[in-house]
């Protein structure tokens, strides 16, 4: 007799072992029809897996997140089979599931063309119609290497050869086609359905290393049903329309260029948004009891070795010698004794150095230390994406040094501050995730137990709902992630709160406790916006460039119908600027409709229009962005109303 416990807590008993599909049928035939896999003690397995012991069991259906991921996994295999049928001689490499879809990398002499995607998609539909049975086989590792070499799959053979000798490997057979894979998979290709779409072509280096050969990557998306697929494709279309790079050009906010990959050239209008954000955050953290600091960009590699970052982040750090030749000809005569210096990829170790200056007492805690810290990370060229993924970034970074007893209170205060900031930015409904210890980590299990428990208890005390993200914590401590949804439904991970018992120990930070002895402070790493670059990119796309008045780079443009009103327009401009409004003047000899249209395209919230009559009466006609109507007001009243609207939320 085996006892199988379901997620609702109920237990079902079976006299003989049975596979996942039979177990689903024993509950309900309708459930068995929806089933795509089974979870046994939290591990995803094929439906054909036999359950022969007591276990916690969950039937995975296609509509669940795990089910959708499985569909995407199978879609990548069906795509690979279709590619090899249509383009014989193509080698397959890897094909993982990614957010909202999947991809597969192929090795092929000739490049794929955009029109090939429709052919591949059509063949995928045919493979689904064939309803090919998918079965798992276990092979000897060496035999698998030889087999894949024999059929010309050099990349697969290389992957298998990296598995320790003597181990077995799993291969999935899909009709007459097979692939190396851990699984699990659907019972057959017919279970996949046809709610998939191939989306784009790209290049990718084998194993992500630019020294290796270039492969061809095909991206796709797959969903549980056609409605979900259509909704996603509509969202993608809307996202393309809102692309911050396109809007950034149209609004003259910033640009990027090859000579400074991953770094942003901020134009005056874009820099105004940056400054408005930075000043807003500075006021909020000042009111919350933070002190602001500034730390060096370059630090000795020994410093990073001590902190533990050298071993973890070395390949993502920009490293330079502290002895630089004066000319290119002098380069070969470096002494070889130069120290290696790293441009900081993060601020936390430097903040500990400030904390360590002078003796700290328990009375000094909590100490909340903030920095708009400019950091550099050596991101791969192919990963860079506008403002969303850069090499040079500025973070609204802060570290809270506190006692263990203060963790709950500090977490509560931070969450309240963060949610207030997001609300001011127009975001509501923050989703929380608690990311726990990764496989590669610093510190002992005992330390991690303490850190994870402290953060979990603080969240429960706040009454906040949260999900666990096993294995996704930082290498020095568990992490609380804050996710937002934008205007078109996309989720963005922005704020973080990371609990760290490790770094203060490594860098010997201490304070004198009430007992007169030295103690290690707890270190809370926290950010609200994340990087300002990325947050501005998100704001651009969320608002489609139509920023709320207080963030708009140009809040008002003054323009004229005839040149007779030019002196009055100049007077209006000065009054607007005196009221603290970011205003510009347009006295061009163009038709008023043309000028209004141009400034509307530039997303200016308010256009002040003046003609001869307005000049004589001391009034102004106001056209608001997105409205076809004009409102005529006394100039002073209009400026007062606009100034109130332009006031940052924390100053109202």
Swiss-Prot record:
Keyword Nucleotide-binding found: yes
Region (Catalytic): 243-548
Top enzyme class: ligase
CDD domains in alphabetical order: TGS_ThrRS, ThrRS_anticodon, ThrRS_core
Keywords, in A-Z order: Aminoacyl-tRNA synthetase, ATP-binding, Cytoplasm, Ligase, Metal-binding, Nucleotide-binding, Protein biosynthesis, RNA-binding, tRNA-binding, Zinc
InterPro entries hit by this protein: aa-tRNA-synt_IIb (IPR002314), aa-tRNA-synth_II (IPR006195), aa-tRNA-synth_II/BPL/LPL (IPR045864), Anticodon-bd (IPR004154), Anticodon-bd_dom_sf (IPR036621), Beta-grasp_dom_sf (IPR012675), TGS (IPR004095), TGS-like (IPR012676)
Cofactor field: Zn(2+)
Protein residues bound to Zn(2+): 348, 399, 525
Compartment(s): Cytoplasm
Main location: cytoplasm
Catalyzed reactions: tRNA(Thr) + L-threonine + ATP = L-threonyl-tRNA(Thr) + AMP + diphosphate + H(+)
EC number, UniProt record: 6.1.1.3
Ranges in coiled-coil conformation: none
Keyword tRNA-binding part of the UniProt annotation: yes
Gene Ontology terms: cellular component: cytoplasm
GO biological process, any: threonyl-tRNA aminoacylation
Record's cofactor remark: Binds 1 zinc ion per subunit.
Disulfide bonds: none
GO MF, one example: threonine-tRNA ligase activity
Residues covered by the TGS domain: 1-61
Protein function: Catalyzes the attachment of threonine to tRNA(Thr) in a two-step reaction: L-threonine is first activated by ATP to form Thr-AMP and then transferred to the acceptor end of tRNA(Thr). Also edits incorrectly charged L-seryl-tRNA(Thr).
Entry similarity comment: Belongs to the class-II aminoacyl-tRNA synthetase family.
Quaternary structure note: Homodimer.
Name listed for the protein in its UniProt record: Threonine--tRNA ligase
Biological source species: Parvibaculum lavamentivorans (strain DS-1 / DSM 13023 / NCIMB 13966)
